């Protein structure tokens, strides 16, 4: 997936879930953060981030990437669906794809033929293990439980798009969200599939470099 033109900046402070301060072109600017996770190891004072200039909206800039020790990391969670869709259009054979499908009071990312897909964006890596979530997510837990509930009608598929390359495996973050962890392992125990996409991030693009089932 191609990225928009990016500019380097220094992260200063996160004001709330959606806005942070960055030092850019000699002054402090407010920048949009499209990610509700904590991102505490990435959005910290003094770290290098890369922003794009937006058209319209309240804030002129949006934080897209942050630098980790061994990898650039994309923190724009909405990109995960685009990355996944680009990947499947190149590698899967299917007849019909629907986006944003509402079922059982939940909205799922894709219905691909008879496969009901929920995609999660992953940014956190600890000791070589990619982990989700990095903040409690009732919505994410609800998605998994509804996937299980609907498994008599659809084939469930849970997808984690890890928007960095410096990891070897994936696990749910049980310490941060025990309820999500419980739902995840219930889903896995029933033999349903979990797909992980590893991405290599550069200043120009994000590429899927490895795909595996957990």
Swiss-Prot record:
Top-rank taxon: Bacteria
Transmembrane segments: none
Molecular function per GO: DNA binding
InterPro entries reported for this sequence: SfsA, SfsA_C, SfsA_N
Family: Belongs to the SfsA family.
Name this polypeptide is given: Sugar fermentation stimulation protein homolog
Organism: Aquifex aeolicus (strain VF5)
Lineage of source species: Bacteria, Pseudomonadati, Aquificota, Aquificia, Aquificales
């Amino acid at each position: 997936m191609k990225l928009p033109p990016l500019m380097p900046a220094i992260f200063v402070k996160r004001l709330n879930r959606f806005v942070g301060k960055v030092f850019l072109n000699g002054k402090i600017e407010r920048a949009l953060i499209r990610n509700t996770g904590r991102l505490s190891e990435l959005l910290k004072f003094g770290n290098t981030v890369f922003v794009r200039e937006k058209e319209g909206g309240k804030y002129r800039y949006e934080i897209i990437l942050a630098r980790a020790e061994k990898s650039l990391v994309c923190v724009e969670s909405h990109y995960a669906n685009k990355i996944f869709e680009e990947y499947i259009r190149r590698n899967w054979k299917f007849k019909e794809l629907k986006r944003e499908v509402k079922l059982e009071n939940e909205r799922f990312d894709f219905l691909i033929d008879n496969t009901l897909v929920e995609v999660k964006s992953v940014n956190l890596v600890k000791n070589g293990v990619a982990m989700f979530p990095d903040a409690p997510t009732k919505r994410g837990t609800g998605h998994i439980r509804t996937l299980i509930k609907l498994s008599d009608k659809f084939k469930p598929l849970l997808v984690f798009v890890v928007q960095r390359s410096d990891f070897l495996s994936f696990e749910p973050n049980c310490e941060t969200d025990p309820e999500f962890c419980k739902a995840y392992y219930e889903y896995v125990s029933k033999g349903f599939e979990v797909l992980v996409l590893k991405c290599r991030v550069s200043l120009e693009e994000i590429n899927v470099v490895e795909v595996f089932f957990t």
